[in-house]
Amino acid sequence: AATCGIHVSQGDSVTVVSVGHGVFTHNEQLHEELMKPADQRDSSVIRQSPDQYAKLKIDELRSACAVFGITDVRIIGTTEPFRIYQSPELITKLRDVILEIRPQILITQSPYAPTRHGLQNNSLDDHTEVAHATLEARNLASTPIYGSNIQPHKIAATYFPGVYFEKDQFDFYVDATNWFEKRVEAENAFKSQGHTEEFSRRRIELTLGDTGWFSGTMYAESFVREKAEVVSKITISEHTLKRSKEPPSTHMRRISGLEH
């Protein structure tokens, strides 16, 4: 999220696409009410329709994206929980979005199911299903469509958020220190999920702070490449080069937020 904000601030175009409306996701208010005795429940929450909740979720997503300057937010809409075999047409819809926008970079859910003890997890999950549908749509967008004059489009690079991986699988970090407050603000937009200012701040402190600690900065976001890239020569980022010449005290000050 902060990474997208950084790119928008530098003139790049960012589009956020949500497969579903989030109708059956994180309805914490309904969950809270149903946990109460029947005579103590808030009837307005109990009677809330899926369409009403969907509108609330969409508004929250748009508000969170607006924090980072993202105005192109698209909600495709599909059956929930999303399963490709139930809504295969979604792949074509995603392909059409790709052909319209023609992005150079795709950041999507990880298609790899998290496992324990090296065991294979074959259960279906919204996140991995969206990842597989998106990657299939990306591949379809790069091939000609019979009966159409639309030029195929091949996305140059695909990345997955590091939150779905172990630290030794990260390919690079984006320093998000200057965007910490924006991340908290965006996180706090999801009121329907029970988020509060205190919870949002603590969550970002722990997640971006943990990534920042291991990357040598205060707050960071991590990414995993789908595949290795071909480069014209070996390059070193400005951050990496600068830090190779600094004393230990500077490193500690930066992690403490006293120096950037």
Regions inferred by a protein language model and the residue ranges of each:
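Active-site rim/loop-helix segments in enzyme catalytic domains that contact anionic ligands
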Residues: 1-101, 254-257
